[in-house]
Regions:
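A structure-centric signal for secondary-structure junctions around beta-strands
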Residues: 8, 28-31, 62, 120
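Short active-site neighborhood of thiol/selenol oxidoreductases, capturing the structured segment around
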Residues: 25-47
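Short beta->alpha junction loops/turns
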Residues: 39, 71, 137-141
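Structural microenvironment flanking redox-active thiols in thiol-disulfide oxidoreductases
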Residues: 42-91
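Short, internal strand/loop/helix patches
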Residues: 66-68, 81-117
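Thiol-/selenol-based redox modules, centered on thioredoxin-like
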Residues: 111, 118-154
Length: 154
């Protein structure tokens, strides 16, 4: 029996700088390294990966890095307020441009990525078709970072 292919499904999203995206096709890299967060308290776990994200993007031509807060579509009416608060907390324009919020069916994202739940962040590498070639859950560990580096080098 073959393993289920993990996918980043098609979703409308917007970066904190206002750029509209149709994911995954509008992602900027041949390969895209994305920290997918599901809860506000996940930002600390995302932050543990950001040093690796910056270094790997410098080392790998065609790799782009993103943060993707994934929020239930029921919060769409207050998107401006929520995105505004996130943008205010991020002084760096490059980081705002790479933080893409998706107000969507969170369960659909979870299921397409093959996640058991949304209690942890998912760090993924995917192409512009959404095919996930690497995935780790939770905060950075040395083992997960080494595995990511090997996947990108392989």
């Amino acid at each position: 029996m073959s393993e289920k292919i993990r996918m980043l499904p098609a979703v409308e999203a917007r970066a904190l700088d206002g750029t509209e995206y149709r994911l995954p096709s509008d992602l900027g890299g041949e390969r895209n390294l994305i920290a997918v967060a599901f809860e506000r308290n996940h930002q600390d776990d995302v932050d543990t990966w950001l040093g690796d994200f910056a270094a790997l993007e410098d080392e790998h031509t065609g790799l782009m890095t993103y943060e993707m807060p994934t929020i239930s579509r029921r919060f769409s009416p207050v998107r401006g307020v929520l995105d505004g608060k996130m943008a205010d907390a991020i002084p760096d324009p490059k980081t705002r441009a790479r933080t893409i919020t998706a107000y969507t069916d969170v369960g659909r994202i979870r299921d397409s990525l093959g996640l058991p739940d949304t209690k942890q962040i998912a760090v993924i590498v995917c192409d512009r078709d959404g095919v996930v070639s690497w995935l780790a859950l939770g905060e950075r560990s040395d083992e997960a970072a080494a595995d990511l580096r090997a996947a990108l080098n392989g």
